[in-house]
From Swiss-Prot:
<dbReference type="InterPro" id="IPR002159">
    <property type="entry name" value="CD36_fam"/>
</dbReference>
<keyword id="KW-0812">Transmembrane</keyword>
<comment type="similarity">
    <text>Belongs to the CD36 family.</text>
</comment>
<keyword id="KW-0325">Glycoprotein</keyword>
<keyword id="KW-1133">Transmembrane helix</keyword>
<feature type="transmembrane region" description="Helical">
    <location>
        <begin position="9"/>
        <end position="29"/>
    </location>
</feature>
<feature type="topological domain" description="Cytoplasmic">
    <location>
        <begin position="524"/>
        <end position="536"/>
    </location>
</feature>
<dbReference type="Pfam" id="PF01130">
    <property type="entry name" value="CD36"/>
</dbReference>
<feature type="glycosylation site" description="N-linked (GlcNAc...) asparagine">
    <location>
        <position position="363"/>
    </location>
</feature>
<dbReference type="GO" id="GO:0005044">
    <property type="term" value="F:scavenger receptor activity"/>
</dbReference>
<feature type="glycosylation site" description="N-linked (GlcNAc...) asparagine">
    <location>
        <position position="236"/>
    </location>
</feature>
<dbReference type="GO" id="GO:0016020">
    <property type="term" value="C:membrane"/>
</dbReference>
<feature type="transmembrane region" description="Helical">
    <location>
        <begin position="503"/>
        <end position="523"/>
    </location>
</feature>
<keyword id="KW-0472">Membrane</keyword>
<protein>
    <recommendedName>
        <fullName>Uncharacterized protein R07B1.3</fullName>
    </recommendedName>
</protein>
<feature type="topological domain" description="Extracellular">
    <location>
        <begin position="30"/>
        <end position="502"/>
    </location>
</feature>
<feature type="glycosylation site" description="N-linked (GlcNAc...) asparagine">
    <location>
        <position position="376"/>
    </location>
</feature>
Length: 536
């Protein structure tokens, strides 16, 4: 009989320790890791009122967001106005702004399940981030949104103005020098604002008194509150309504989901006609996400700037600063209002204008079953376009009719792109909303948001200004926003979410392998010793 040596006992204990350690890592690491991840991601505050780290980062997004505005210069304004010609456009820009956000006046519900805040935004022009060759003082020719809005209100089918009042307005627009196209500097049209004679008259006391005297006081609601006009008028140092969001305290799967916006749990019927379209789904701007992403995930989010909710789906794998990501993008279907499921997002088209007569035409379309031209007694817009029904980010009506699309009508059929000169859609440059997220934590490391703002122009015989204009939708500008998290966030994700799990993943195999090697060595030695004793 061979006695058990001390070194064998010690070796066996070490092997058992390594094996159990490796097995414990195998079984327990991911449940513990996921529990810690959820715990650290929940939004909350300390007893002294200071925010937990995750809530602090949420309130002060650690990202550099460069927003570039590309405008469209109309090169043939006279031909469009007098001959009804196809607008010829040249894209100019981008003109860069640094956008920063800060959530203020935050508070938490007594049960810790909800967080309140106001999201303040600032925009600073950044010449160094401009595309080469462009200056903030560049002049462009663009559609006169204020005048077109006035024509739509006064001469549209829903107008309450008498024929005499319409004649006076038509003459008045000409006397004020209003023209379908105007030329201003980029800084004026984007942020600084310019004085428009129509706005000045509309806000004058005499005009308001006359309108009320003749019984058109209700029409004053259509006059924009702005005294000067700019696309981003009033947005600097402003906030986009009040939010209550889910902290994930009770249900981590609802982390960041908007519970109410502007005091509303669903959008008003004045925005969208169907209950489904009015739903507020997912987190604010998609800033928070579930963990452990898969290619089958559908991630909803609410974008107050566009007055609606979207979903994003898996697009492709990628790399951001050396970290593997899954890119989730808003798919084509979300912009297709010809689909019945998106019927609530359709443009009302009360003017009943067929803006794209070549689209879905029985003489040119091979399969009419693949497109829907009309609904509810009016013409539908082709896929890739939907209306902006609120003043972006606010529970208020827009100052004039605006349509939203991906840049260069990327998601629209060729008939839309060919209806204007200068449209060159590129999926790599113009895909509307892409979130590059780290798979395990769901952290958005890079976000690219792109959208185009378009103005519908109507040939209206009752208005001198637009009597010879074509029925056309003209792009005003598109925004190309590129947000990238700061280096310390990259480092935290790299170390805590990638390196540590990878080390544990390797270590558990190494420990189990070492334990097996030790036990195998002991067994071999034991067999040899036993064989030697037997021979003797």
């Amino acid at each position: 009989m061979v006695s058990i040596k001390r070194y064998e006992i010690i070796s066996f204990v070490i092997a058992a320790f390594f094996f159990l350690s490796g097995l414990s890592m195998w079984i327990a690491f991911w449940p513990i890791f996921n529990s810690e991840l959820r715990s650290n991601y929940k939004l909350g505050a300390n007893d002294d009122g200071s925010l937990h780290y995750a809530a602090f980062l949420y309130a002060n997004p650690p990202m550099k967001n460069v927003m570039k505005f590309n405008l469209f210069n109309v090169t043939n304004p006279d031909e469009v106005k007098y001959l009804g010609a196809k607008p010829e456009l040249i894209e100019v820009g981008g003109y860069a702004f640094l956008e920063s956000e800060q959530k203020k006046y935050y508070e938490f519900s007594s049960d810790k399940t909800k967080m309140f805040y106001q999201n303040y935004k600032q925009y600073h022009y950044s010449e160094v981030d401009n595309d080469a060759g462009y200056n903030y003082n560049d002049k462009i020719m663009f559609p006169n949104s204020i005048a077109e809005g006035a024509v739509s209100t006064v001469f549209g089918p829903q107008s309450e103005f008498s024929p005499t009042a319409k004649i006076l307005v038509s003459i008045g627009l000409v006397m004020l020098g209003e023209y379908p196209f105007i030329s201003k500097t980029v800084k004026d049209v984007l942020m600084d604002g310019y004085e428009d004679p129509l706005l000045s008259v509309a806000h004058s006391g005499i005009f308001i008194s006359l309108v009320n005297f003749y019984g058109y006081g209700s029409q004053l609601n259509y006059i924009p509150e702005m005294k000067t006009f700019a696309y981003l008028s009033g947005y600097n140092n402003s906030y986009d309504e009040n939010y209550w969001i889910n902290t994930g305290y009770n249900d981590f799967n609802k982390l960041g989901f908007v519970e109410s916006w502007a005091g509303l749990e669903q959008l008003p019927a004045s925005f969208w006609p169907t209950l489904e379209a009015r739903q507020i789904k997912g987190p604010d701007s998609g800033s928070l996400s579930k963990i452990h992403l898969t290619k089958t995930d559908e991630l909803p989010f609410f974008l107050s700037f566009m007055c609606r909710s979207f979903k994003r789906t898996y697009w492709q794998d990628g790399l951001v600063d050396g970290i593997k990501t899954m890119a989730f993008a808003v798919p084509y279907e979300e912009f297709d209002t010809t689909l019945e499921k998106n019927a609530g997002f359709r443009y009302k088209n009360q003017e009943n204008v067929d803006y794209f007569p070549d689209w879905c035409d029985k003489n040119t379309t091979t399969s009419l079953s693949q497109c829907q031209k009309t609904a509810n007694g009016t013409f539908l817009l082709p896929p890739g376009i939907f209306p902006l029904v609120c003043y972006p980010g606010h529970n208020a009506q827009p100052p004039f009719t605006v349509l939203v699309s991906p840049p260069h009508f990327l998601y629209s059929p060729p008939e839309v792109q060919h209806h204007l000169s200068g449209m060159n859609p590129d999926p790599e440059k113009h895909k509307p909303m892409v979130f590059h997220q780290e798979k395990t934590s769901g952290t958005a490391l890079q976000v690219d948001v792109r959208f185009q703002v378009n103005l519908p122009v109507v040939n209206n015989k009752g208005s001198i200004m637009s009597s010879q204009m074509p029925n056309v939708i003209i792009p005003l500008f598109y925004e190309d926003s590129h947000a990238l998290v700061k280096d310390f966030v990259m480092d935290t994700v790299w170390l805590g979410v990638i390196i540590v799990p990878r080390i544990i993943e390797y270590l558990k195999f190494v420990l189990i392998f070492i334990s097996i090697c030790i036990l195998t060595t002991l067994l071999v030695i034991r067999v040899r010793v036993k064989g030697t004793v037997s021979v003797v």
